[in-house]
Amino acid sequence: MERERCPQCGARWLLPARQSREVVADDGVRLTYADELTACLSCGERYYKHQQSLASSRARAAVLRKHAGLLTPDEIRAFRERHRLTQAQLEALLGTGPKTVVRWEKGTVCQSRAADRLLRLLIVNPKNVEFLAARGGPDDPAVAAGSPGDGPR
């Protein structure tokens, strides 16, 4: 099998390189995480292969998630599986967009604080799952119109 070539210069002198990356959390705190990419020893080009890019996204999200005290991907998956929900069903229950839960469970994206709080309410009281399921999803006319006693929107 032929060795991979540098996309910049065509050389075959490629090695994995580690670097420390910085990200700023919502509260302004600077956080660092380890990142791996590919470096060409010939021209100095540095780039991500697909798996390195995914790993970088996961590492970035993990440091932000830990700092914010959000549920982990494993905790979200365990909750969903315990209630025998598919990812699409949980998305409908929460009113999120398509593939949102997939990204949370893969660890490539952090859930918002609001979504995290809602998930925690569902975790501590399974009756909340039943309550939301009974109300339907965001496209349900009964939900869109609100219920009697709802305040102004």
Describe each region flagged by the PLM.
Residues 1-70, 124-150:
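N-terminal flexible/basic segments that precede or flank functional cores
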Residues 13, 35, 39, 83, ...:
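Functionally constrained cores in energy, signaling, and assembly domains
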